[in-house]
């Protein structure tokens, strides 16, 4: 129809429910300010978008992110939809210093007088992407014949807040 704008870049119906809930969590924990200490505005917004994607879709497959971004609200300026290649490049750009700095600041905000009980869990993930240093053959929980990566998280058992996370090569046995 004449006068109608082209809507091919974004869906005309955005799924805002989970975004509203998770946006409140970002505000309550000041995650945007905390992440802003270590990331540019663009990178912080993309990181939040990818975190939301991972939670909502229960997936971290970069090639599916653009499909998710098409019909969900985004933090990225202008709700820009980044390609899977851009997502991959972004993850490569996250340094150990940024990750450790964020964790140190996150943990510095904890109530030091409160007793905590730490739970630790690790798992492995099949990896079909090429040339990832951590991806090695090992003992996968669900063996599909591909290389795997291992990752672990330590969190406060009482409130489920993460305290520590780590990725390590797939050839190291998961013994947690």
Which sequence ranges carry the predicted segments?
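Surface-exposed acidic loop/strand-edge motifs in secreted or periplasmic proteins
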Residues: 134-136, 140
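Carboxylate/His-rich catalytic cores and anion/metal-binding grooves
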Residues: 141-145
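Residues that act as N-cap/strand-start positions at coil-to-secondary-structure junctions
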Residues: 147-149
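Dynamic "connector" segments at or just before major functional cores
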Residues: 1-134, 151-174
């Amino acid at each position: 129809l004449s006068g109608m704008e082209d809507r091919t870049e974004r869906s005309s119906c955005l799924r805002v429910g989970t975004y509203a809930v998770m946006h409140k969590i970002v505000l309550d924990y000041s995650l945007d300010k905390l992440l802003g200490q270590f990331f540019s505005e663009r990178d912080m917004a993309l990181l939040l978008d990818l975190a939301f994607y991972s939670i909502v879709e229960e997936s971290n497959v970069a090639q599916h992110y653009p499909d998710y971004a098409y019909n969900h609200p985004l933090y990225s300026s202008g709700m820009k939809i980044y390609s899977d290649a851009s997502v991959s490049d972004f993850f490569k750009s996250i340094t150990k210093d940024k990750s450790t700095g964020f964790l140190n600041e996150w943990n510095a905000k904890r109530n030091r007088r409160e007793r905590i009980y730490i739970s630790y869990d690790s798992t492995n993930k099949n990896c079909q992407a090429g040339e990832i240093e951590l991806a090695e053959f090992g003992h996968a929980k669900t063996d599909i014949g591909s290389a795997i990566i291992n990752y672990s998280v330590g969190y406060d058992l009482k409130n489920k807040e993460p305290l520590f996370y780590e990725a390590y090569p797939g050839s190291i046995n998961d013994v947690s």
